[in-house]
Amino acid sequence: LDRLTWHLSRFQGFAGIANFMGGRFVVTDAVMQPIIREAAKRGLGYLDDGSAPRSVASSLAAAQAMPFARADLSIDAVPTAVEIDRALAKLETLAKERGTAVGIASALPISIERIAVWAKALESHGIMLVPLTTAMLKSKSG
């Protein structure tokens, strides 16, 4: 927790924190509780990367009344143009069905390229790309 507090004190302008490759970590209430509490105290949201089906982050975030979102899918789990495009199409379907959908991706050049192409066509598909904080607040209220 000391490391988290130190890192959080060094940056400005971010809206929240997220787990990364912490599947075992996010399923343990006693481990996650102080992290969620510290983030909530600072007015931050939490993005669960969706890697752990038994993650306790959602319930802990709800208990703190903090903004929260869970990634619906990893867009570049298979980092090829075809698979990224397929994942983005699935993300669109989820967004149309539920009103919002959250995808995560790494900063691979192919991921950035495919997301940029996809984002340009969203309006013609009846979808609006919004900041993650919008999805977090929608999740918190709904």
Identify the function of each model-found stretch.
Residues 2-88, 100-101, 106-127, 133:
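Catalytic domains of cell-wall/extracellular-matrix polysaccharide-remodeling enzymes
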Residues 91-92, 96-99:
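C-terminal accessory segments enriched in acidic
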